[in-house]
Amino acid sequence: DEKKLNDEETLNNKDQNIKLSPDDEFQRAFDMLRNQNFEEAKFAFQQFIKNNKDNSLSGSAHYWMGEIFLLQKSYREAALVLAEGYSKFPKSVKAPDLLYKLADALIKIDKKMDSCNTLSKFIEEFSNNRLIEKVKKKIIDQDCQVAIE
């Protein structure tokens, strides 16, 4: 067993020393998430963001990290990661999703006004997005004082 463990450690160390392309690094983190290895995925997404500050996938990495925090009921951490993702990558393909999930995280930490403002921002920025009806429903459910035409 000790020999096997050492072989696994060597394999893991070799993997860490291989420089992956940003796409491969993101895919590796996403595969960990898909396999429900949440802690490893969270760490891998953090590393991806650190290593690829300007990569177009960094917004998506923030989104998936936020999702992991939401799954783990770490709502404050989710809100921080999702807000950072949106503020740094407002043009990301995941920007609407970042705002949508940010509103969820904010309501969970009793930040109703911030959640409502986030939903309002969603409507301003992404009025034709596939999530718009869900956003409007959330605004009504949370009794936000926001125009939803």
Model-predicted regions and their roles:
Residues 51-57, 88-94, 123-135:
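Short solvent-exposed coil/turn linkers within tandem alpha-helical repeat scaffolds
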Residues 1-35:
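Acidic, proline-/serine-/threonine-rich low-complexity intrinsically disordered segments
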